[in-house]
Amino acid sequence: MIIRTADALGIDGIILSGSCDLYSPKVIRSTMGSIFRTNILIENDTEKLFSMLSENKVTTSAAVIDKDAFDVTKCAFEGLQAIFIGNEGNGLPKDIAERCDRRIIIPMHGSINSLNAAMAAGILMWELKK
């Protein structure tokens, strides 16, 4: 779902780390061909990833559930951007969030305090493209 949404919104690429098998038949089917039109990098080495992003002057944001994080709807996304999204069970690891340039949150109403990863990714990618 994330890959398909990225393709639909014209996101430049996706970086995966420690995720499911990208080339499993189920994943390929669910992307409806987007897997073949989207730039995808698999990088499990955090040091290497942050070094690469820094060298390319990419601003990094950590999607977190934290009242002190910046409201994503009020963020200015200028230049190259990378948003880190954690998994649904544990969220983004603390060490990754702390290395990012800023922490962002999707504002939610009522008693809802989190979304599944695909839904959060879709909202965040939409905000990037505004």
Feature roles, as predicted:
Residues 39, 44, 56, 87-90, ...:
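Detector for Asparagine
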Residues 8-9, 19, 27-35, 94-130:
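Structured adenosyl-cofactor binding patch, chiefly the S-adenosyl-L-methionine
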Residues 55-57, 77-85, 123-130:
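Short flexible/disordered coil segments
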Residues 61-112:
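Active-site/ligand-binding-proximal alpha/beta "capping" segment
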Residues 1-70:
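RNA substrate-binding interface of SAM-dependent RNA methyltransferases
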